[in-house]
Amino acid sequence: MALSAEDRALVRALWKKLGSNVGVYATEALERTFLAFPATKTYFSHLDLSPGSAQVRAHGQKVADALSLAVERLDDLPRALSALSHLHACQLRVDPANFPAPGPLPAGDPRPALPRRLQPGAAGVAGQVPEPRDLCAGFRVP
């Protein structure tokens, strides 16, 4: 899904506001994922998953760095995220079906308009994670 110039500008403006806190927010999102979806912990059994652990913060920073790369290269997300997609699909054997993209906000959602306007950007990034069978010969979900 191609993003409009307005969508790209909106995503970049938000990212600029997040500034140096992107790693903190990504870590918090990771911790919330572990709480809301405990099954995701199986992919991180080698880490200390206690809130605020150095290992969770380090992985949160990796997520933040990947998202920052995506924001820098919004015009070419497939190429920007291809190495990351290959790593997760072929080496780590992560099934993208376990990590669905966030759905749209309901029409009457009382939250501010900004998150709704950013949905195309989030969907654009999530949509760049190809099916493992498209990347890796013989892929099977463990």
From Swiss-Prot:
Binding locations of heme b: 59, 88
PROSITE patterns hit by this protein: GLOBIN (PS01033)
Domain Globin: 2-142
Gene Ontology CC: blood microparticle; haptoglobin-hemoglobin complex; hemoglobin complex
Disulfide cysteine pairs (residue numbers): none
GO molecular function: haptoglobin binding; heme binding; metal ion binding; organic acid binding; oxygen binding; oxygen carrier activity; peroxidase activity
Entry keyword Iron: yes
Keywords associated with the record: Heme, Iron, Metal-binding, Oxygen transport, Transport
Biological process (GO), any one: hydrogen peroxide catabolic process
Family: Belongs to the globin family.
Protein name: Hemoglobin subunit theta-1
Protein species of origin: Papio anubis (Olive baboon)
Lineage: Eukaryota, Metazoa, Chordata, Craniata, Vertebrata
Gene: HBQ1
